């Protein structure tokens, strides 16, 4: 099922074109990476696709329902989330638990299934053993993993991730990529992830969308084949 469709999107800053004629899509059960050199407007494309920034022209269609006919839920993880207010008076467990309420309902009590899901979310990023620590005591990488665990606790249908493995070591990165691959292929999630290093994730992602440009022209979007060759518009 197609969750996100972007057609002929163009975005301008102060009348200067940044993105031009962008076309791409993301389906349920698919893990897609978005790459491009530094300054390639990857984050701008994500924000324009989500409506955080208003594209100048083009169409963005996001499905209203998931594969079960329920309201589609999207989790967006922006870049540098480790800089969030870690002075928030909460333990890691309480922080991750708060991510469950939008799915459950703010005024409904969590049951044993919810608690199991919270534990699994913490386990998935190696944070269960840190569950009783205060957010303010965490390292940058641990804060990143705590925010990711909270995102998992909300059980979204679509993951939009902007360089989510910042601050993680190589082993933790591979575990995260495997987790996202599993979420897509075994649970029908749609994953769109910005990464600066496509080589790290090539064994896990289904395809890569690459932003390129010629000289000073705006960035355009291309699919990248397994052999690294550009094969046309995404």
Curated annotation (Swiss-Prot):
Binding site for ATP: 36-43
Domain ABC transporter: 4-234
InterPro entries: AAA+_ATPase, ABC_transporter-like_ATP-bd, ABC_transporter-like_CS, Metal_Ion_Import_ABC, P-loop_NTPase
Keyword ATP-binding: yes
A molecular function (GO) term: ATP binding
UniProt keyword Transport, yes or no: yes
PROSITE patterns (alphabetical): ABC_TRANSPORTER_1 (PS00211), ABC_TRANSPORTER_2 (PS50893)
Keywords for this protein: ATP-binding, Competence, Ion transport, Nucleotide-binding, Transport, Zinc, Zinc transport
GO terms of biological process kind: establishment of competence for transformation; zinc ion transport
GO annotation, cellular component aspect: ATP-binding cassette (ABC) transporter complex
Pfam families reported in the protein's UniProt record: ABC_tran (PF00005)
Sequence similarity: Belongs to the ABC transporter superfamily.
Function: Part of the ATP-driven transport system AdcABC for zinc. Required for transformability.
Record-given protein name: Zinc transport system ATP-binding protein AdcC
Lineage of origin: Bacteria, Bacillati, Bacillota, Bacilli, Lactobacillales
Primary gene name: adcC
């Amino acid at each position: 099922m197609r969750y996100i469709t972007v057609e002929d999107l163009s975005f301008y800053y102060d009348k200067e074109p940044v993105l031009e004629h962008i076309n791409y899509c993301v389906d349920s059960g698919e893990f897609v990476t978005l790459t491009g050199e530094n300054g390639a407007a990857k984050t701008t494309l994500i924000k324009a696709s989500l409506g955080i920034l208003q594209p100048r022209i083009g169409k963005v269609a996001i499905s209203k329902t998931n594969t079960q006919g329920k309201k589609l839920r999207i989790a967006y993880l922006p870049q540098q989330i480790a800089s969030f207010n870690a002075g928030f008076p909460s333990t890691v467990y309480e922080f991750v638990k708060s991510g469950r309420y939008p799915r459950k309902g703010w005024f409904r009590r969590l049951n044993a299934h919810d608690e199991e899901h919270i534990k699994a979310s913490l386990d998935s990023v190696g944070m269960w053993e840190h569950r009783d620590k205060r957010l303010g005591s965490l390292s940058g990488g641990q804060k990143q993993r705590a925010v990711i665990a909270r995102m998992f606790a909300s059980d979204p249908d679509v993951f939009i991730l902007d360089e989510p493995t910042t601050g993680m070591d190589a082993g933790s990165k591979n575990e995260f990529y495997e987790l996202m691959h599993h979420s897509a292929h075994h649970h029908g999630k749609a994953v769109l992830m910005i990464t600066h290093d496509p080589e790290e994730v090539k064994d896990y992602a289904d395809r890569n969308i690459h932003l390129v440009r010629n000289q000073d022209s705006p960035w355009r979007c291309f699919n990248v084949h397994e052999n690294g060759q550009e094969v046309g518009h995404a």
